[in-house]
């Protein structure tokens, strides 16, 4: 009885709620030493929050946002609908038209707050991406082949991958594959035999993933056919909303209308059954500023958009917001940032933060527009990005590393990609656990080691509970590593006893990772780089 009364008092003290017309306003004051993560899935603010920010409406803008926050003091904030939020530095002000939003006490740690919120509001449903996405790279040839990649170009690209000594994986078909944008039918002009091309790529060892968007060309036959049937998102003045994206300016389907959703879902099912397509890369980023005009609103639109992958475990999303369950697909964060050293630092931080917000299978990629002038990019940036990608749940490759002119960097890139398969079994284990428990695959150190001074550590992370990853994020081959309590073993068998802060040098651009020694034993030691440079023999490092 005493504990319940105390909790009730705290809620009143730290969350004052008042009804203003149709809006609910809640102020959440920070507890002593409390740090918060949330709201911005990518490209928003450094986390945990430090600097104040002005009022932000989560239902508007292009950035990827979520009405979910967690704190290192065991509290969380969650809403099924977007809200507006302001941060003063010592309190949050949340305004919502959908109902009261408050801070809920779920325990004492970041992990407890995250897991309680997940299981209460969007529990794991037992679904997860295909293991094949974890063990082989995903190649996106948009940069080299352009928007309208042809059958010949795609098959030639697959041959280049294999000829260069890279493993087969998943090949993404850019969004211009349709006969008319919005038809969801292959172009006979680009593909003489679409099903035959898919079979040929399968024979080479590749899986095929189609880029799918909600867009419809404003001057095409699909738009003219459906314009009078309220199939598209419209502005309040009844004019059709036109969004800018890679294909120009286009209308887009209103998936919150049941008949529209069923139409698109049926087309995607037909692409799989009629042509042998393995999965889809869903991209609705250009539509984000206008989703608030959808019949059901922005949250309902993104929820229905996320449901298009139901029944297919071979999918990626660039933007999504499912609220009925834990995300069960690969979430591909595309950062709108120049491809440079700062991009790498932001990618590492955003990737770990996204794992704290209900996206356990998150990867980070640069936008293609940021890769337009590759000749000016330091070759080591490519190398470091591939190293970082190699420890993500899915290894996405958005450029052709076999075309890098620096021979040493090119050789290192190929070794990294080929050695990715060594992590496959461990990732399968993590994904199998995550789909049942909701545990993130990549974990913030504060999540795994609470109250040990890691709240501000955003350039290291845990891969499950076994591996500490300290990615190299600049041109140097060494970096400062913060070791938690315990014994940590590197690829050479060297041990580090934590807590410890020390500089570690990576030999020959090896990925810096360390396995936690449990009861004097090392279970995995599946490193990305442990091939002997002298004779090419694979050596397993012992303890």
Model-derived segments and spans:
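Leucine-biased recognition of intrinsically disordered, low-complexity hydrophobic segments
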Residues: 7, 19-20, 512, 528
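Sec-dependent N-terminal signal peptides
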Residues: 2-17
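Short, intrinsically disordered, low-complexity terminal segments
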Residues: 2-3, 19, 503, 523
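Catalytic-domain carbohydrate-binding cleft regions of carbohydrate-active enzymes
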Residues: 23-509, 529-531
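Short, Lys/Arg-enriched, disordered terminal segments
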Residues: 1-6, 22, 538-543
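A generic signature of intrinsically disordered, low-complexity regions enriched in glycine/proline
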Residues: 6, 258, 287, 494, ...
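C-terminal beta-strand-rich structural cap/linker in extracellular carbohydrate-active enzymes
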Residues: 498-537, 542-543
């Amino acid at each position: 009885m005493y504990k319940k009364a105390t909790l009730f008092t705290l809620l009143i003290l730290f969350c004052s709620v008042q009804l203003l017309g149709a809006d609910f306003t809640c102020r959440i004051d920070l507890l002593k030493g409390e740090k918060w993560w949330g709201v911005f899935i990518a490209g928003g603010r450094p986390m945990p929050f430090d600097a104040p920010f002005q009022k932000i409406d989560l239902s508007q803008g292009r950035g990827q946002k979520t009405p979910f926050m967690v704190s290192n003091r065991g509290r969380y904030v969650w809403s099924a609908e977007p809200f507006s939020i302001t941060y003063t530095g010592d309190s949050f002000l949340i305004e919502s038209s959908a109902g009261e939003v408050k801070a809920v006490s779920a325990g004492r740690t970041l992990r407890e707050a995250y897991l309680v919120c997940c299981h209460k509001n969007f529990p794991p449903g037992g679904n997860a991406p295909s293991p094949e996405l974890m063990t082989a790279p995903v190649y996106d040839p948009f940069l080299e082949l352009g928007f309208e990649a042809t059958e010949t170009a795609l098959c030639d690209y697959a041959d280049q991958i294999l000829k260069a000594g890279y493993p087969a994986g998943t090949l993404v078909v850019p969004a211009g594959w349709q006969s008319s944008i919005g038809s969801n039918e292959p172009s006979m002009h680009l593909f003489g035999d679409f099903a035959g091309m898919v079979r040929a790529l399968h024979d080479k060892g590749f899986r095929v993933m189609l880029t799918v968007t909600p867009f419809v060309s404003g001057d095409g036959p699909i738009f003219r056919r459906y314009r009078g049937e309220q199939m598209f998102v419209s502005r309040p003045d009844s004019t059709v909303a036109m969004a800018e994206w890679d294909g120009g300016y286009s209308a887009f389907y209103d998936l919150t209308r049941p008949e529209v959703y069923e139409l698109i879902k049926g087309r995607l099912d037909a692409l799989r059954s009629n042509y042998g397509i393995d999965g889809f890369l869903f991209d609705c980023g250009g539509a984000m500023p206008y989703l608030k005009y959808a019949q059901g609103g922005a949250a309902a639109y993104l929820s229905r958009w996320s449901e298009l992958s139901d029944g297919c475990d071979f999918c990626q999303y660039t933007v999504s917001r499912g609220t009925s369950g834990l995300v069960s697909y690969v979430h591909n964060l595309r950062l709108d940032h120049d491809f440079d050293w700062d991009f790498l630092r932001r990618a590492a931080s955003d990737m770990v933060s996204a794992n704290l917000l209900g996206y356990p299978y998150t990867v980070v990629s640069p936008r293609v527009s940021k890769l337009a002038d590759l000749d000016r990019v330091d070759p080591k940036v490519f190398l470091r990005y591939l190293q970082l990608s190699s420890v993500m749940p899915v290894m996405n490759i958005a450029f052709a590393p076999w075309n890098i002119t620096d021979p040493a960097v090119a050789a290192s890139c190929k070794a990294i990609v080929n050695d990715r398969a060594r992590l496959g079994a461990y990732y399968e284990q993590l994904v199998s656990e995550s789909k049942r428990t909701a545990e993130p695959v990549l974990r913030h150190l504060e999540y795994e080691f609470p109250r040990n001074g890691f709240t501000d550590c955003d350039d290291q992370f845990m891969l499950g509970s076994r591996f500490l990853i300290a990615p190299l994020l600049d041109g140097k081959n060494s970096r400062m590593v913060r070791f938690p309590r315990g014994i940590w073993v590197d690829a050479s068998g060297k041990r580090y006893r934590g807590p410890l802060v020390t500089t570690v040098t990576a030999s020959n651009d090896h990925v810096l990772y360390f396995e936690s020694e449990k009861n004097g034993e090392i279970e995995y030691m599946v490193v990305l780089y442990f091939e002997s440079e002298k004779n090419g023999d694979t050596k397993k490092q012992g303890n």
